[in-house]
Structure formats: structure tokens, C-alpha cells
Design a protein with these regions (language model features):
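Active-site machinery of serine-nucleophile hydrolases
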Residues: 112-179
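A domain-start/cap signature at the N-terminus of enzymes
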Residues: 7-114, 389
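Gly/Ser-rich "nucleophile elbow"/oxyanion-hole loop immediately N-terminal to the catalytic nucleophile
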Residues: 107-111, 158-194, 204-210
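Primarily recognizes the serine-hydrolase "nucleophile elbow" in alpha/beta-hydrolase
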Residues: 124, 185-240
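Short, proline-enriched alpha-helix->beta-strand connector loops that line the catalytic pocket
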Residues: 240-246
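The conserved beta1-alpha1 loop
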Residues: 117-121, 217, 250, 356
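C-terminal catalytic histidine-bearing segment of alpha/beta-hydrolase fold enzymes
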Residues: 9-10, 249, 255, 259-355, ...
């Protein structure tokens, strides 16, 4: 379990009885299904439960082991996917014309070592998971990856971020990990055309959950000037990718997705690297391939990222929130993230401190999660926000 250093004074709670603690934990774990896990009411209630659990005394080592086992046992009981290849639906019980949550399973369906989410192309009124599944099935299997190719819930220009599809993809990831006992540190996003947009965007929003992303012939949403020239991309992409392996494929003569947005994104990543350090990014541009798959097929693209593993404890986090329901990013939690602001959090091992910069803006409802691999928890730990020390003390493991 993590240690938590809160940057604001915790609310004093009455001491909870053991039964009350178990009931609160169970309620927290059971809150929200695949359609409402990120609703405001659910998130608010989870926040209330966490605040109430502040009253639980620091955990002894034996208590920590018991709680970890309890969490693991409960997580194993949650819904799983059908353990078979082929097409199915996350919500299969409706009439055939009303079924939602289509996805195709392929790749290594035996004992996969990782998970690939393959995102299809399309647009307004179009888009089908099955051609994308066919393209990634063999390459994923040869690389010991389970492949899941979801279909967007609504076929719009930005289908991967519209109408609950983003949450649907995250639910598939969780259920796949649980069903096949997949290494959580080997989850990859890739996709072609609009699926390239999806892997760029969802990859950035949830970089803390991934090992790598490989967009193909699709870019992040560009920003154009009055003359129609690309000069930037939308917020919430480049900063968040600092600790994620990314390879972006593009053909210079692509008539459907021109190279402008991906070239701009590459420039912005180069600038971000100079500013914040980090980044593990490759831009793979060729000519003469049009809107087709990369030379050598999707397998060659996957080879660019498949050996990467998720970095769960990066020395530096850069986070630009764009989703009000995304409260956790690596080892920080922000109850009410300020949209589009940029937060930089550093582990300063030399002074045994966490240093956070927000551009001078106030920071409230913020929690830092630490363990023995990050700082020396036998000594005092400091939390410094915008050069002001807001916490100093010996940390103890909390529920």
C-alpha cells in the first residue's frame, strides 16, 4: 500500500470500528460499473469514503498484508471477459440491433504476456472493429500479446473520445487483465487513421496505465490559423507523454491524414524534452505509402514499443489534466484537477522531498503517494509546492 502525504490538513474523523472500515472499503470497491464508474456522483462518494478512512490508524505490517490480500481477492471477483477469440459485446443482453460495446478478441488468447488495444479508423457514420482486428491479430499473437479491438460506441469524427468510448476502453483493459492474468505493466495502445488519433489521445490521457502507444496514419487534434495552416495541437497530449514509449508512423503523401499534425506534435515533443527532460519518442515518416499500413505491416510498428514496460514510479511527472474524472496520474491524486493547467511533480531524493510546481497557482485537494522505493520513509519527508513547504514529517502507511 502507498504512503500518502496530503498537501492540505485532513479532516478529523471519529474513530471507525473495524466493521465500519470494512463496509466503507467494500462500498468504495463496488462503486460504479462500466457505464457510471466516472460519473460525478460516484467520484464524489469515493472522495467522501477516502476522507472517512483518514480516521483509520496507521497500518502495521501484518495489517498491510491482510488489506492487500483483501483488495486482490475482491478485484478477482469483478466482471471478466469471455475467454475466447472472436466478436462479442460488453453489454450483450439487449436486442441485436441495440447491443453496445462490440469488441473483437485475437492475438495470443492462451497465456499472453501483454495486452494490445487496437483502435479502428472511420469517422462520422463509419468505423468497424473487425478490419482492424484482422490487421493486428497475427502481429499481436507473434509477440505474445492478447489483442482486443473495440468498436467506438458512436461513430463520430472523434469516436474514441465521444459518448463513453474512452471509459469503455478502460473497462476492457481492466477486465482483460483480470481474465487472462496479464502483466499490468505491459499494456499498449495502437491504431490506424482515427485509431491513430485514439491511441495518441487516450494514450496521453492515461499514460500512467500504459507501457507504450503506437499511432499509425492518425494524429492528435490539430489547431489551425485563419488560413488553415497547422501550428499547434490540442492540450493534454504532449506534457502527459513524458514517461511513455511512443512511436508515431506517418506517410508524407497520405491524402486522408496529411503529415502536418504529426509533424507539429513531434516538434512540440522536442520542445517539451528540452523543457522537462524525459520522453521516449520516435517519429517514423516514410513516403509513397499513402494512407496504408506501415511498411512491413503493423508488426513492424509494434516492434517499436513491445519491449517497453510501464514506469510506475517516474522521477518526474508532468500532467496536464483534460478530463474532470481523471483524478489519479502515476503517484499523485488531484480531487478537483484544474483543466489544462500543467503540474510538474519531482522526487528529490537528495533532500528526501517531493517538489511540485503549478506555475504559481494554488493547489488544493492533492495527495502524494509514496513507498520505500521512492524516498527514505524512515526519515522526515517534505512536500514543497511552488517553493513553499506545505508538509514535513515521518510518514506511516495508511489505508
Amino acid at each position: 500500500l502507498p504512503f500518502a502525504a496530503a498537501t492540505s490538513t485532513p479532516v478529523v474523523q471519529d474513530k471507525l470500528k473495524a466493521k465500519e472500515v470494512r463496509e466503507l472499503v467494500d462500498e468504495y470497491l463496488e462503486l460504479g460499473g462500466p457505464e457510471d464508474a466516472y460519473e460525478a456522483e460516484v467520484l464524489a462518494r469515493r472522495g467522501e469514503i477516502l476522507a472517512a478512512l483518514d480516521a483509520v490508524p496507521p497500518l502495521k505490517k501484518s495489517d498491510r498484508k491482510k488489506w492487500i490480500k483483501r483488495f486482490g481477492d475482491r478485484w478477482d471477483e469483478w466482471p471478466k471477459l469471455e475467454k475466447s477469440a472472436g466478436r462479442t459485446f460488453l453489454w450483450p443482453d439487449a436486442e441485436p440491433a441495440q447491443r453496445r460495446g462490440k469488441y473483437v478478441v485475437g492475438g495470443d488468447t492462451g497465456k499472453p504476456k501483454g495486452l494490445l488495444i487496437a483502435m479502428h479508423g472511420g469517422g462520422v457514420g463509419s468505423g468497424d472493429a473487425e478490419p482492424m482486428a484482422a490487421g493486428y491479430d497475427g502481429p499481436a499473437g507473434k509477440r505474445d500479446l492478447l489483442m482486443i479491438a473495440p468498436e467506438v460506441l458512436e461513430k463520430t469524427e472523434r469516436g474514441w473520445t465521444d459518448s463513453g468510448t474512452e471509459e469503455f476502453v478502460l473497462e476492457l483493459v481492466e477486465r482483460a487483465i483480470r481474465t487472462w492474468d496479464i502483466d499490468r505493466d505491459r499494456v499498449y495502445f495502437s491504431g490506424h487513421s482515427m485509431g491513430g488519433y485514439g491511441s495518441w489521445t487516450l494514450g496521453a490521457h492515461h499514460a500512467d496505465l500504459l507501457a507504450g502507444a503506437a499511432p499509425s496514419a492518425g494524429g492528435p487534434t490539430p489547431i489551425m490559423d485563419i488560413a488553415g495552416n497547422f501550428y499547434d495541437i490540442v492540450e493534454g497530449i504532449v506534457p502527459n507523454l513524458r514517461n511513455l514509449r511512443v512511436c508515431c508512423y506517418q506517410s508524407a503523401d497520405d491524402p486522408r491524414v496529411p503529415p502536418g499534425p504529426n509533424r507539429i506534435a513531434t516538434e512540440k515533443i522536442e520542445q517539451a524534452t528540452e523543457r522537462w527532460g524525459g520522453y521516449d519518442y520516435e517519429y517514423w515518416e516514410v513516403d509513397g505509402m499513402g494512407h496504408a499500413a506501415p511498411p512491413g505491416g503493423y508488426g513492424d510498428l509494434l516492434d517499436k514499443i513491445v519491449d517497453a514496460r510501464r514506469n510506475t514510479r517516474p522521477e518526474r511527472i508532468v500532467w496536464q489534466p483534460t478530463l474532470d474524472w481523471k483524478r489519479d496520474f502515476y503517484w499523485v491524486r488531484w480531487e478537483e484537477p484544474r483543466m489544462l493547467s500543467v503540474l510538474v511533480a519531482d522526487l528529490d531524493r537528495e533532500t528526501n522531498a517531493v517538489r511540485i510546481e503549478t506555475g504559481g497557482r494554488a493547489l488544493t485537494g492533492f495527495t502524494v503517494y509514496l513507498d520505500e522505493d521512492m524516498l527514505d520513509l524512515d526519515e522526515e519527508v517534505a512536500v514543497v509546492v511552488n517553493d513553499e513547504e506545505v508538509f514535513r514529517g515521518i510518514l506511516e502507511p495508511t489505508l
